Amino acid sequence: MRLKEQIAILALGAGFAACTPKPPPHIIEDNMEFAQQQLRFAFDEIDYAIVNESPESREKREKNGWGELTNPRNSEPDGTLNLVPSKDWTSGFFPGELWYLYEYTQNNFWKKKAQQHTDMLEREKVNGTTHDMGFKMYCSFGNGYRLTQDEHYKEVLLQSARTLATRFKPKAGIIRSWDHSTARWACPVIIDNMMNLELLFWATKESQDSTFYRIAVDHAKTTMKHHFRPDFSSYHVVDYDTITGHVLKKNTHQGFADESAWSRGQAWALYGYTMCYRETRLPEFLEQAENIEKYLFTHRNMPEDLIPYWDFNAPDIPNEPRDVSAATVIASALYELSLYDAEKGQRYKDNADQIMDNLTKHYRATLKKDNGFLLLHSTGTKPTNTEVDVPIVYADYYFIEALMRKNKLEKTGKLF
């Protein structure tokens, strides 16, 4: 560990009680109790949605071989719960929430529920049509293995990593994202893909196969080279020629415009490079994460409550929808980033605490309503008016993860 990091950890541990603005006195306990009650209600909502699935939805699933409905994704504007099969990129977040509740409570009720909702996803370990293996498998099986050391979970994760590695394009140095939209892109890579690298780093340590490490580092370095503008904002989509490795175009899919800063994309980048630094200790990854953080928190359009609008360049700010999911990802990333810089660490944690305080006070769902989700006001894909200003499962997952990180950090001064 570098001296700078050791000083950062000591300074944080000593300074939390004296320097940190005090959030509500029991923000962790209050939110975790709320989460337990709300997710118990969510099980009833899930059962109801399965029983009342429309014939059209069932026929479409069966025709395409998508399998059974597994986990919640979002609330629709009319209040109905949208459940997804395992193939959906969001299918791993709900089981991940359950594993965190088991870790926090040590109550076997949550362990059994987590196992049930995790096991539904096993078929995805050989699904080579997607880059989202980290989201789906590491949030679910990864948390499960961390807490249980179940050898079967380990094998599922290793196979998932092997499957993800098949999407690596060595000439370009990237992991391909989507297979769709071939008329628009040859080999698209989205900034979200930084989040899937943690599975590869884990697989390196568990298998002693450095191939996974090299793929993850190559992808992170190539993304750092081509996805970012001089101000350290990120493009959403970069398209590559897999033969020459050259960049073909830079676009957006979920942001306001090609040259805008889609908020959740910036959050994925912050989290991804913070994690990459943890796994590699390469200083360029820490520098990248800190530059992204600086971009976010000095941006003129960052709201006072630190809950971003869906795009930092959206045309009708302050009347644009917020994206709570971006805020939860940022908060979770900041708790980790606070460990790695002695001078800025306290500020990073203070900002994370402010985000969590404001989410708790102003963005939380109503108990035993809102389909059992924890947070309101996330935005999925505004350009197509999909999942706009609704509860979305990944906002809840990173909210609980941030609470767990805050709890560990304040009790032990470390996270891992």
Predicted feature residues:
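Bacterial Sec-dependent N-terminal signal peptides
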Residues: 1-26
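Glycan-recognition and catalytic cores of secretory/periplasmic carbohydrate-active enzymes
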Residues: 22-416
